[in-house]
C-alpha cells in the first residue's frame, strides 16, 4: 500500500464516520405530488366580468346577514382574480416547485339556467336514487344550455397547467350551488319545503349527476384524477346544525341535516358512475377529517360515536356498501382514492341530555375552537382563525384512514390563516414531517397540496383570513411571495425536508 492509497482509505473512513452522525433529511418519493388547491368562489372573482350568481353569492351580499355579522361584508368580486390571472399564479406555483393542481369547477358558472327540463332516465326505489342515465341526446341538450365561455375558460386554465407538466385533479363541487338549485335566503324565510332547498331536495342528486356527466364529457381529456366534491360533511353540518358559522342556509334543523347527508352520499355515488362512463381516471372524494380525541378516558365511546356519524358513515357506505342497517350495492366500491383536508384536532367529551343519554360535545379551547392568535388549553399557538396548530394529528388521521379502507390518499388541504407569516414555515415543515412518518409506516400517501398558494376569499370570514404562501394585494391584484414560499420551494423541489429545515420539524419553544 503506497502513501496515496493510505491517505484515501483514511479519508474515506473519517468521511463515513462523520456521516454517521449527520442528519441527512427526510426523503420523499420522487413521484410525490406537491401542489395547491383552489375553489372557484374563493379565487376566481376580482376582475371585471368575472362575477357569477350562486347561493353563496347572494348569501354574502345579503344585507340582513351583513348587519347581523353572519358574514363579513367583504365581497367576492373584490377577490384575487384567478379567472383572469391564472397564468400568473401558475408561473408562481411552478417557480416554487409545485407539480400538481387541484382545480375547482363551479356548477353555477356552467349552468346558470336550470337543467331540470332535460329529462333523463332514473332508477329509484325506497332506498334512494340508484342510477341516473345520460345518453348522447342528453349531453347535446346540456351543451346547448351550458355557458360556453365558462367552459372554454376552464379548458384554458387546465390546458395551461397541462402544458407546464402539472398533474391535474379536477374537483366538481366546492359548496356554491346554482341559485335555481338552492336559494338560502328563501329557505331561511319560507323553509326547506317551499324554496329551492339544495341538498335537502333529492332532485339535486339528479341535476348534479347531469352536470358532472357533462363536465367529464367536455373536459375529461385534460384530467388526471377526479374528485366529486369537497368536504360534504361541512355542508350538512354548517348549513343545518352549526348555524352560527355563517354558512348557508343557516337553517337549524336536524332532519334536514340528515337528509342532506344522505343525498350528498348518493350524489357522489351517481357522479362516480357517470364520470366512469367518460373517463378511466381515478375518482375520489375530499373530506375534512380532524384528529378526533377524547378529553378523558371515559369519553372514548363518545369519540367513536362522533367519528361514525361525521366520518365513517360516508366512507363505510362508499367502500363497503354499509348504509345505516343495510347494504347497498349501488354505493359499494364507489371510491378510488381519498382526499384528506387536515387543519387541526377535535377534543370530544360527553354532554348528558337526560339520564344516561349523551351527545358528543366538542370541547372549546382545543382544535378549531380556540381564541385567535393565542394559545390552546394545551399551550399550543393558534392561528388568526383560532385554530390550534397540532401537526401530529395529521399522522393519526392518515394512518387510521389507511388502516380502515386501504385506499390511496392525498393530503388535499393543509394550511394556516397567518397574515404575518409568523407560524406558516413551522406549520408547513412539521405537517410534511408527519406525512413522511405516515409514508414510512406504509400509508399509500401520494401527495401534499397546500391551502393555499395565494390569499383567497375565506367564505363568511371574507378577506381577513390569509392562507397564502403568496400575499395578494386585493386592490392592485399584485402577488408577493411570503418567506414561507421559499421554505415550500426547498421541500418541493428537493422532495425532502433538508437538514437546514430540521429545526422546524418539532413545535417551537413557547
Predicted regions mapped to residue ranges:
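Non-catalytic scaffold segments within catalytic domains of secreted glycoside hydrolases
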Residues: 14-90, 94-96, 104, 108-510
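Intrinsic-disorder-associated, low-complexity terminal segments enriched in Asp/Asn/His/Tyr and depleted
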Residues: 2-7, 11-12
Amino acid at each position: 500500500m503506497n502513501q496515496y492509497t493510505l491517505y484515501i482509505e483514511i479519508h474515506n473512513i473519517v468521511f463515513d464516520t462523520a456521516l454517521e452522525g449527520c442528519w441527512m433529511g427526510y426523503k420523499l418519493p420522487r413521484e410525490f405530488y406537491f401542489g395547491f388547491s383552489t375553489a372557484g368562489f374563493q379565487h376566481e372573482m376580482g376582475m371585471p366580468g368575472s362575477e357569477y350568481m350562486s347561493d353563496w353569492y347572494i348569501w354574502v351580499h345579503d344585507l340582513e346577514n351583513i348587519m347581523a355579522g353572519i358574514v363579513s361584508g367583504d365581497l367576492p368580486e373584490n377577490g384575487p382574480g384567478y379567472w383572469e390571472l391564472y397564468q400568473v399564479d401558475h408561473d408562481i406555483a411552478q417557480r416554487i416547485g409545485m407539480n400538481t393542481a387541484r382545480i375547482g369547477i363551479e356548477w353555477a358558472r356552467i349552468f346558470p339556467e336550470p337543467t331540470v327540463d332535460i329529462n333523463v332516465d332514473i332508477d329509484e326505489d325506497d332506498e334512494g336514487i340508484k342510477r341516473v342515465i345520460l345518453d348522447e341526446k342528453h349531453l347535446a341538450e346540456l351543451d346547448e344550455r351550458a355557458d360556453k365561455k365558462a367552459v372554454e375558460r376552464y379548458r384554458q386554465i387546465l390546458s395551461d397547467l397541462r402544458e407546464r407538466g402539472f398533474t391535474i385533479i379536477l374537483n366538481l363541487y366546492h359548496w356554491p350551488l346554482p341559485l335555481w338549485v338552492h336559494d338560502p335566503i328563501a329557505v331561511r324565510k319560507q323553509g326547506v319545503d317551499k324554496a329551492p332547498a339544495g341538498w335537502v331536495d333529492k332532485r339535486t342528486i339528479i341535476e348534479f349527476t347531469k352536470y358532472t356527466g357533462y363536465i367529464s364529457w367536455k373536459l375529461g381529456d385534460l384530467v388526471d384524477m377526479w374528485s366529486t366534491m369537497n368536504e360534504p360533511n361541512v355542508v350538512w353540518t354548517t348549513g343545518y346544525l352549526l348555524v352560527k358559522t355563517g354558512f348557508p342556509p343557516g337553517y337549524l334543523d336536524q332532519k334536514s341535516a340528515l337528509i342532506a347527508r344522505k343525498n350528498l352520499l348518493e350524489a357522489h355515488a351517481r357522479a362516480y358512475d357517470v364520470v366512469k362512463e367518460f373517463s378511466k381516471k381515478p375518482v375520489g372524494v375530499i373530506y375534512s377529517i380532524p384528529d378526533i380525541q377524547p378529553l378523558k378516558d371515559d369519553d372514548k365511546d363518545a369519540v367513536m360515536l362522533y367519528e361514525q356519524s361525521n366520518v365513517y358513515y360516508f366512507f363505510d357506505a362508499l367502500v363497503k356498501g354499509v348504509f345505516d342497517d343495510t347494504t347497498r350495492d349501488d354505493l359499494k366500491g364507489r371510491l378510488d382514492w381519498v382526499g384528506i383536508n387536515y387543519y387541526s384536532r377535535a377534543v370530544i367529551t360527553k354532554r348528558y341530555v337526560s339520564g344516561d343519554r349523551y351527545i358528543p360535545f366538542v370541547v372549546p379551547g382545543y382544535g378549531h375552537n380556540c381564541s385567535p392568535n393565542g394559545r390552546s388549553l394545551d399551550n399550543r399557538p393558534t392561528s388568526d382563525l383560532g385554530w390550534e396548530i397540532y401537526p401530529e394529528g395529521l399522522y393519526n388521521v392518515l394512518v387510521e384512514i389507511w388502516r380502515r379502507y386501504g385506499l390511496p390518499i392525498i393530503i388535499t388541504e393543509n394550511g394556516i390563516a397567518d397574515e404575518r407569516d409568523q407560524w406558516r414555515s413551522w406549520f408547513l415543515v412539521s405537517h410534511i414531517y408527519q406525512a413522511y412518518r405516515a409514508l414510512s409506516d406504509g400509508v399509500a400517501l401520494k401527495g401534499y397540496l397546500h391551502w393555499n398558494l395565494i390569499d383567497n376569499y375565506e367564505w363568511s370570514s371574507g378577506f381577513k383570513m390569509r392562507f397564502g404562501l403568496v400575499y395578494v394585494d386585493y386592490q392592485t391584484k399584485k402577488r408577493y411571495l411570503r418567506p414561507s414560499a421559499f421554505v415550500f420551494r426547498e421541500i418541493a423541489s428537493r422532495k425532502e425536508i433538508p437538514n437546514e429545515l430540521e429545526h422546524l420539524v418539532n413545535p417551537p419553544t413557547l
